[in-house]
Amino acid sequence: SHPEIEEFLEIRKPSGDFNRKALNLHHGVLLTDEFMEAVRNGDEFQLRSPKDQSVRATVDARALFQKLVETRLATGEPYIVFNDTVNRMMPKHHRDLGLKVSTSNLCSEITLPTGRDHLGNDRTAVCCLSSLNIETWDEWNGDKDFIEDVMRFLDNVLQDYIDRAPPEVARAKYSAERERSVGLGVMGFHSFLQARTIPFESAMAKSWNLRIFKHISARAQEASMMLAQERGLAVVPDVRSHA
């Protein structure tokens, strides 16, 4: 709903006024339920000032959404996050405390609470990330300790950050201490399929996808529970919350 959204969408396009461009800046947008309902219904949508919420312009929601999609097709960006959906899907103990996800990183794999929390403290989301190389699936899927080792490595990195964090990043340290968030993703799935001459959109590719991620999810959850038993739970937000 930002008044400058239309120009913002085009900042990476090499055409037009070069002084209004940022070709090397990666950007993203948040799409609300309100906007998507306007797109669905073919309604107009108000663009409002983020400062005082005054209406600065009214646009055709479908035309704006089409422009966004065409810009993604041409430039690969902006990234898109459906922020109302993200907040609906937050863990229940976060929702019960009134925590809110305001935004994410561009790739949108990190969706953690930010801003002022229920204890009156400011948070800056922190999450340690790593990727498993699916191209080498055959080398590690039978090793029962492999994913546990990666999860342990991520938690060690997070603890090292907490121990070393200077006062200037107190909000980030606080957030890391409250949740101890880590993320284990993948890369190389396309290379995995190519090595087996499996079409990307085939039923076989879908079957492998489900098999691989089921394996990773189960092992990662086992490792998380093991780490909790060894090192204790992350800081509990309050007595009503869950581990």
Task: Briefly describe each language-model feature range.
Residues 34, 67, 188-192, 208:
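A general alpha-helix detector
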Residues 146, 181-185, 216:
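Short, contiguous, pocket-lining structural segments
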Residues 149-173, 177, 196-243:
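Internal maturation/activation junctions in enzymes
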Residues 7, 130-131, 180-195:
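Contiguous, well-ordered alpha-helical segments that form the cores/surfaces of helical PPI scaffolds
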Residues 1-139, 143, 168-174, 220, ...:
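Active-site cavity-forming subdomains of large catalytic enzyme subunits
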